[in-house]
Amino acid sequence: MPRDNMASLIQRIARQACLTFRGSGGGRGASDRDAASGPEAPMQPGFPENLSKLKSLLTQLRAEDLNIAPRKATLQPLPPNLPPVTYMHIYETDGFSLGVFLLKSGTSIPLHDHPGMHGMLKVLYGTVRISCMDKLDAGGGQRPRALPPEQQFEPPLQPREREAVRPGVLRSRAEYTEASGPCILTPHRDNLHQIDAVEGPAAFLDILAPPYDPDDGRDCHYYRVLEPVRPKEASSSACDLPREVWLLETPQADDFWCEGEPYPGPKVFP
């Protein structure tokens, strides 16, 4: 990559991502997909320092640095033939991918995971609400805690679905704008998240390290947070975080898909 002082900000971000995530290509494989509570895979020497530098660069990034004009909100409903989310590909190596997701008004990227991956998300315009979660697994080859027989949900689950329910934890739910620092995920912390556009369109830069690769155990899985049936007299503590939740893996929703669109910003060179 060019090393002159006139390099664009996105070029410097890509260069720093190369340093931060070098050697991360290849991941940890499918057998580690559910190891959300185990020790984190060892990273290259200097990883914390390089990650801090990358976070600092991302914090500076704005939509105009990528020649992206903020989309305007519309009161018209989204036509059913248009994707709710689009993606601008910027750059990718075996170690990381770099691109921009653009969400239309009132749309969401459903709850999903990032097996064995680090991620960094920096809002470029608009506001997004990010709910961060993790699966709670026993580790050591043991099965995760089973769903108590008396636990019921609304709507009710089928017997096969009950067998697939897994415990999880909702760690945080916060809103991010272009003035916010990046949202960070690791293989074992905040690895699942849902992203909602709040009061209008939004866009964010996304770094995933290493990129998704189903052949190497890094496929994207979607989840639903189950709503437990609570006694009427039970006090609600839904706002208390972190809190335990029950998760059910689901197929990708029919009303969610993502299509590509051209990236208008400065080119990133190897």
Swiss-Prot record:
Any one annotated GO CC term: mitochondrion
Chain segments carrying region Disordered: 21-48, 140-164
Keyword DNA-binding part of the UniProt annotation: no
A GO MF label: iron ion binding
Enzyme class at the top of the EC tree: oxidoreductase
Cofactor(s) the protein needs: Fe cation
Listed EC numbers: 1.13.11.19
UniProt keywords, alphabetically: Dioxygenase, Iron, Metal-binding, Oxidoreductase, Thioether bond
Residue sites binding Fe cation per the record: H112, H114, H193
Cross-link 3'-(S-cysteinyl)-tyrosine (Cys-Tyr): where in chain: C220-Y223
Xref: Pfam families: PCO_ADO (PF07847)
Swiss-Prot/TrEMBL catalytic activity: cysteamine + O2 = hypotaurine + H(+); N-terminal L-cysteinyl-[protein] + O2 = N-terminal S-hydroxy-S-oxy-L-cysteinyl-[protein] + H(+)
GO biological process: cellular response to hypoxia
Top-level taxonomic group: Eukaryota
PANTHER family: 2-AMINOETHANETHIOL DIOXYGENASE
Subunit annotation: Monomer.
Role of this protein: Plays a vital role in regulating thiol metabolism and preserving oxygen homeostasis by oxidizing the sulfur of cysteamine and N-terminal cysteine-containing proteins to their corresponding sulfinic acids using O2 as a cosubstrate. Catalyzes the oxidation of cysteamine (2-aminoethanethiol) to hypotaurine. Catalyzes the oxidation of regulators of G-protein signaling 4 (RGS4) and 5 (RGS5) and interleukin-32 (IL32).
Name of this chain's protein: 2-aminoethanethiol dioxygenase
Species, as recorded: Homo sapiens
Phylogenetic classification of the source organism: Eukaryota, Metazoa, Chordata, Craniata, Vertebrata
